[in-house]
């Protein structure tokens, strides 16, 4: 997704990215909001079920984001906790694109179950979440 989002498969999710081509700014580099995984864990379920993605315009006006971009050469391997805000940045028309492999590592059983997720929600709506965090 080209909007910032979190992956909802598992709160213990870890992804590995391997670039097979050089990735420059216009090639759609992986982009991550540094330390966002800590804030997101507190609001995991509301983001998972209430907000599919967050446009950058919604974030940048209210938050000074500490963004890390994966602008790297072919052969680069990096790890990301994609429970934090991340995206694949927009690809420019001049770009030849990028080729990468992504591996996902998840727990055997998520630490939270659907039976108790309502009691873990610190916010009552996506609107409440956005107002208090962004």
Language model: regions and residue ranges:
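Histidine-centered catalytic micro-motifs
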Residues: 2-8, 85-88
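Short helix-to-loop capping/linker segments positioned immediately adjacent to catalytic or ligand/cofactor-binding
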Residues: 3-4, 18-20, 64-68
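Residues in well-ordered beta-strands of folded domains
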Residues: 5, 17, 31-33, 102-104
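Alpha-helical and His/Cys-centered functional microenvironments
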Residues: 9, 38, 90
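Short, conserved beta-strand element in jelly-roll/cupin
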Residues: 9-25, 71-74, 79, 104-108
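Double-stranded beta-helix
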Residues: 25-85, 110
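Non-heme Fe(II)/2-oxoglutarate
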Residues: 77-79, 83-134
